[in-house]
Each structure stands twice: as structure tokens, then as C-alpha cells.
Amino acid sequence: MNITTKTCAITATMIMASFFTPLSFSEEQTDFKKVGEARMEYLFWDVYDATLYTRSGSYKQGAHPVKFTLTYLRDFAAKDIVKATKEQWQHLGKSDLSAKYADKLLTLWPDIKKGESLSLQTSPSGQATFYHNDKKLGEISDSQFANQFLAIWLSPNTSEPALRKQLLGI
């Protein structure tokens, strides 16, 4: 093979890789089936719509990958979302998580406007990635974080058992 042929072959390979690599990532992000959805209400306010997705369309505690999306029905400051997260971890007896993750969540999460979404998507190994309106915000590589975050809604001990049942489709 002469140098011109080798150069053309390498160039063609690089062009093909640039076209096909993004497809695999976008497939990975969209290859989920809905398990369930629910609306969180507090007193007379609609707070958010929550939707749980898995690859199979059914949820097994601790199994990954999972996608969990909150679509907010009101404006919220990031600090208020983190505060509510900490309160829910305290309800579950996981106060240690507040100290461990609160600052990281404050740096990741933006203020949310009505109609915007905040999503958690986990990798097969359980690594957590957050998205705001499908735009990547950042990752938390601790494999236990995702399970503890999802427990706020999916644990049998959640403060919102009716919402949990709807999310799990039971």
C-alpha cells in the first residue's frame, strides 16, 4: 500500500468514527423505557412531575442503568432543591449523605425555572450523571450515590409512598 492509499484509508476511518461514535452515545441516552410517572404535590401546589425509566421498563432496586427525571412545575433556586434533598435523606436516616454530597450538588445544579427538567442517569456500573434539560451538568462517580439519591423516591421508607407506587407502576 502506498502512502497516498494509507493516508486516504486513515482519513476515511477517522471520518467514519466521527459519524458513528455520537450515535452510540445518543442511543445509550435514549434507549430507556418508562417504568412509571407521578406528580408531586404539596398542599395545593404542583411541585414537579417525576418519571422513572430503565432499559427493560421495570425497576429492580440497585440495578443500573436508570434514568430519573424531574420536570419542575414551579421555579426553584438550586439551594432550595439541595435543602429538600438533605431533608429527605434525613427522613431516610441518611444524614451523613448531606454532609458528603450537598456542596457537590450545589455546584452541579442550576436554579430551575418552571418547565425545566433535572435528570439523573446512571451507567451500568452505577455512576451518576446529572442533566439539566438534557444538557450534561456533571458526574458523581461514587457508585453508592445514585442508589441513595433514588431512595428519596423509591425506598419503601420514602416520605411519599403513593408517589413511589406510581413511579414503580404498582
Feature map (PLM): residue ranges:
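Terminal leader/tail segments of proteins
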Residues: 23-132, 136-170
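N-terminal signal peptide c-region/cleavage motif recognized by signal peptidases
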Residues: 16, 20-21
